[in-house]
Amino acid sequence: MTYLYDNSTLWIPILLGFLLFLYFFPVNLWITALFSGVRVSLFELVFMRIRRVPPRVIVESMITATKAGLQVTTTEIETHYLAGGNVPSVIRALISADKANIKLTFKQATAIDLAGRDVFQAVQISVNPKVINTPSVAAVAADGIQLVTKARVTVRANIQQLVGGAGEDTILARVGEGIVTSIGSAASHKEVLANPDQISKLVLQRGLDAGTAFEILSIDIADVDVGENIGAKLQIDQANADLRVAEAKAEERRAMAVAVEQEMRAKSQEARAQVILAESEIPKAMSAALKSGHIGVMDYYRMQNIKADTNMRAAISGEGEPNTETEGNPNIQ
């Protein structure tokens, strides 16, 4: 019984050692690489495992590249993996570029991949151009009519400008700017509706793909709709603004006229008060004249008759009310 127990416990470390050997020495992967024409030693696979590089990713990528006729080494692929790159995507991009006769080196592909771009998708766009639909672009012609335009931009990836080149957003912004400029330079919106291809020609002549990761192949106007009459709307707004300014100025003049009228009324009242004050001094002056003998009693009555006659005439003509003031006879001594 002791002998059997010792034999059963002996198989455990042997099994663990065998599994550990298979982990560090991927024999099956080495055999696959050997029969696929990839020359990689078993110790290289062990060192990859020690450096925490998955040997299967490196070996499968090497097999794919070798079968496609690419000249790459395990060191280059392993270095790109350690740098954080997507090794399978780079290999697929290199194969696609090679079959399409596109000049793309392993160094360029890894640089594009490490720059954050999908290098395989970039090669696909370079082979099969991509169509970008622009959002609605509103522009106003010289006659004030608004036009709402949609365009389709056909682009092809520029492999040489993928690192550091602007993306789709820049293309869309530049195309929109070109459409606005082209429509704005048209004398009438009818010209744009009659010849929408003129917009495409003018936009293409501006070289909008400079400094971008794409090459613009064509710009096609998909739809042109007539919007609002912006010119008439602006004229109405301007007329309303002018009307409000005129009303404000008229109100200002009216207020000034009212102020002047009130001022004149105040001056008139002041003058009338002065007249009344002066008239109140007349009886005193006449009394003094009578006392001093400068006028006689008959002169006084003659003046009273003239005054009564004047009041009567004014009452008849309606120009004023008769003077009902009762003046007492002066005390003649």
From Swiss-Prot:
<comment type="subunit">
    <text>Homooligomerizes.</text>
</comment>
<comment type="function">
    <text>Found in functional membrane microdomains (FMM) that may be equivalent to eukaryotic membrane rafts. FMMs are highly dynamic and increase in number as cells age. Flotillins are thought to be important factors in membrane fluidity.</text>
</comment>
<dbReference type="InterPro" id="IPR022853">
    <property type="entry name" value="FloA"/>
</dbReference>
<comment type="similarity">
    <text>Belongs to the flotillin-like FloA family.</text>
</comment>
<keyword id="KW-0812">Transmembrane</keyword>
<keyword id="KW-1133">Transmembrane helix</keyword>
<dbReference type="GO" id="GO:0045121">
    <property type="term" value="C:membrane raft"/>
</dbReference>
<dbReference type="Pfam" id="PF12127">
    <property type="entry name" value="FloA"/>
</dbReference>
<keyword id="KW-0472">Membrane</keyword>
<keyword id="KW-1003">Cell membrane</keyword>
<protein>
    <recommendedName>
        <fullName>Flotillin-like protein FloA</fullName>
    </recommendedName>
</protein>
<feature type="transmembrane region" description="Helical">
    <location>
        <begin position="11"/>
        <end position="31"/>
    </location>
</feature>
<dbReference type="GO" id="GO:0005886">
    <property type="term" value="C:plasma membrane"/>
</dbReference>
